[in-house]
From Swiss-Prot:
It is found in: Nucleus. Gene3D superfamilies: 6.10.140.140, Classic Zinc Finger. SMART domains: KRAB, ZnF_C2H2. It is linked to Polydactyly, postaxial A6: A condition characterized by the occurrence of supernumerary digits in the upper and/or lower extremities. In postaxial polydactyly type A, the extra digit is well-formed and articulates with the fifth or a sixth metacarpal/metatarsal. GO terms for cellular component: nucleus. CDD domains: KRAB_A-box. Keywords: Developmental protein, Disease variant, DNA-binding, Metal-binding, Nucleus, Repeat, Repressor, Transcription, Transcription regulation, Zinc, Zinc-finger. A zinc finger (C2H2-type) spans 171-193, 199-221, 227-249, 255-277, 283-305, 311-333, 339-361, 367-389, 395-417, 423-445, 451-473. The lineage of its organism: Eukaryota, Metazoa, Chordata, Craniata, Vertebrata. This is Zinc finger protein 141. It comes from Homo sapiens (Human). SUPFAM superfamilies: beta-beta-alpha zinc fingers, KRAB domain (Kruppel-associated box). It comes from the Eukaryota. Residues 4-75 form the KRAB domain. One of its GO terms (molecular function) is DNA-binding transcription factor activity, RNA polymerase II-specific.
Length: 474
């Protein structure tokens, strides 16, 4: 049996080439080489050059060990056996399966594989690939196509303005014929056709196709917001939202209209703008004259006027005109409160309610009434307050004709006319017509007093009680 060396099973780099690989690719190289070594030893093949094996096991740079003089070839990652150096029957298949398994498992973006080769120059695991003139191709010049039997690489190149293609017999992905440069992208794409959603949220049961989107979704339940803006301190759940936000501070407008040259900081804004050039007219609501650029948004808006409420709660039968509103409503029944105040530990069902609550601790009241100078922490409360000065009561009860300044007051009033008490206390089974009354009632069972007076440190269960108390100090 001929003695094998690591020159015969060679993956070779210069120091400069090694530095071009990212850590994942370096780790893949080490793992493949060591597994090759172990497989050969297990088959009784004598292996020379133990220094390289030791170097790999200690995770040192492989170019520190002199395997042999580096041959003059383009900078690439090459792994090969020659036809003459297969000492044991079946080891060739074993080698191919090993590399293919490693490749498919790790899904490294810019490593490409060819199978079924018989000579030294035919079988390569490489970056980008070579053409038939042994010229190195960039990864953008290669496409991984899905064949029914195996994964193959087609390397396309140009020479003297002639287009040539290697490795015939390839088959595109049969579902749609789409091809990909990256094996991981192909794997992800196939999920679309399969309709598969393997990632299911244990909290709400929602399923996702991609692990990345699933992980971002889980942060809704945990309240985690790992992305913080250094400019303004805003925090975000997803990296995509954070990236969009940063453009506000930089003034960057990366999305440019090819028709007129106008630039935008968001792709969605560019899409809306393009409708002007396409001759698409904005949609105007005949009821309130509000203008919409999206037909889907207009369809949602029309439900306000028609009273259509297609999203119904299975627990209590209450219906809503938006799916997001139904999702928020369901938390009443589940008791879920994913948004927690870091100051006092109070939890909320909606992030907007948490943001409003935070102003209790900061004392911030940015919204001021021009009529009386009174300030408010929420713009909505200011708008409702203004109706005191105007005397406006736009919300009228259809049952008795009584009018109200706020729609919430009318909604609460309408429950007088019905015997329905949908809000039930889990502690004592007492039921209430209004959710606010249930919230007040629940404080009987707890000692929670979140509203604290800054002047005397006295605490109260209700914010209204704190306001009454403050008058003592003034």
């Amino acid at each position: 049996m001929e003695l094998l060396t690591f020159r015969d099973v060679a993956i070779e780099f210069s120091p400069e080439e090694w530095k071009c690989l990212d850590p994942d690719q370096q780790n893949l190289y080490r793992d493949v080489m060591l597994e090759n070594y172990r497989n050969l030893v297990s088959l009784g093949v004598a292996i020379s050059n133990p220094d390289l094996v030791t170097c790999l096991e200690q995770r040192k740079e492989p170019y520190n060990v002199k395997i042999h003089k580096i041959v003059a070839r383009p900078p690439a990652m090459c792994s090969h056996f020659t036809q003459d150096h297969w000492p044991v029957q079946g080891i060739e298949d074993s080698f191919h399966k090993l590399i293919l398994r490693r490749y498919e498992k790790c899904g490294h973006d810019n490593l490409q594989l060819r199978k079924g080769c018989k000579s030294l120059n035919e079988c390569k695991l490489q970056k980008g690939g070579y053409n038939e003139f042994n010229e190195c191709l960039s990864t953008t010049q290669s496409k991984i196509l899905q064949c029914k039997a195996s994964v193959k690489v087609v390397s396309k190149f140009s020479n003297s303005n002639k287009r040539k293609t290697r490795h015939t017999g390839e088959k595109h992905f049969k579902e749609c014929g789409k091809s990909f440069q990256k094996f991981s992208h192909l794997t992800q794409h196939k999920v679309i056709h399969a309709g598969e959603k393997p990632y299911t949220c244990e909290e709400c049961g929602k399923a996702f196709k991609w692990s990345l989107i699933f992980n971002e979704h889980k942060r809704i339940h945990t309240g985690e917001k790992p992305f913080t803006c250094e400019e303004c301190g805003s925090i975000f759940t997803t990296s995509s939202h954070f990236a969009k936000h940063k453009i506000i501070h930089t003034g960057e407008k990366p999305y440019k209209c090819e028709e007129c040259g106008k630039a935008f900081n968001r792709f969605t804004t560019l899409t809306k703008h393009k409708r002007i050039h396409a001759g698409e007219k904005p949609i105007t609501c005949e009821e309130c004259r509000k203008i919409f650029t999206s037909s889907s948004n207009f369809a949602k808006h029309k439900r306000i006027h028609t009273g259509e409420k297609p999203y119904k709660c299975e627990e209590c039968g209450k219906a809503f005109n938006r799916s997001t509103t139904l999702t928020k409503h369901k938390r009443i029944h589940t008791g879920e409160k994913p948004y927690t105040c870091e100051e006092c530990g109070k939890a909320f069902r909606q992030s907007s309610k948490l943001n409003e609550h935070k102003k209790v601790h900061t004392g911030e009241r940015p919204y001021k009434c021009d009529e009386c100078g009174k300030a408010f922490g929420r713009s909505r409360v200011l708008n409702e307050h203004k109706k005191i000065h105007t005397g406006e009561k736009p919300y009228k009860c259809e049952e008795c004709g009584k009018a109200f300044r706020r729609s919430t007051d009318r909604s609460q009033h309408k429950k007088i006319h019905s015997a329905d008490k949908p809000y039930k206390c889990k502690e004592c089974d007492k039921a209430f017509k209004q959710f606010s009354l249930l919230s007040q009632h629940k404080k009987i069972h707890t000692v929670d007093k979140p509203y604290k007076c800054k002047d005397c440190d006295k605490a109260f269960k209700r914010f209204s009680h704190l306001n009454k108390h403050k008058k003592i100090h003034t």
